[in-house]
């Protein structure tokens, strides 16, 4: 079983996934962290901020290698992004070469009310985020749904939307456990 779980920043994904992992014992692998670890081993970077400055070809190579590693793992949840918002538009978080290697059985998107997400982002002093609005958060969540549908068409994996209601991360975690238990 390999499931991909995503959500926009501030949706509460880390909290929910911590509960899922504790209750199931399933390993959570952060795709970006795996890419960073590979780059660091090769001596390409010393910190995560340097990842953005690597050439496109090197980044694609790191993506492929991280995906290959994940593809060898059993019973794992991949924590990543369905789409990445840039000043130029949305980039796919799971390009074709990543989808093929990961071979996920399910794509799960954690969502929350955009107003709640905005409040969480505004109250998080540990992150330097771009200026956001309820509308831009709503748009990003809609884009994530569209990308998930496209990935599903390519891969044959199911798509499930899970709502993380305020103060109810346990409910969202249990909804996820029901989906991944089928695998």
UniProtKB/Swiss-Prot annotation:
Similarity comment text for this entry: Belongs to the archaeal adenylate kinase family.
Localization, UniProt: Cytoplasm
NCBIfam families to which the protein is assigned, alphabetical: PRK04040.1
Any Pfam family: AAA_17
Stated name of the protein: Adenylate kinase
Gene3D superfamilies in the record: P-loop containing nucleotide triphosphate hydrolases
GO cellular component terms given for this protein: cytoplasm
Keyword line: ATP-binding, Cytoplasm, Kinase, Nucleotide-binding, Transferase
The protein's Enzyme Commission number: 2.7.4.3
Keyword Nucleotide-binding on entry: yes
Species whose genome carries this gene: Thermoplasma acidophilum (strain ATCC 25905 / DSM 1728 / JCM 9062 / NBRC 15155 / AMRC-C165)
Binding-site list for ATP: 7-15
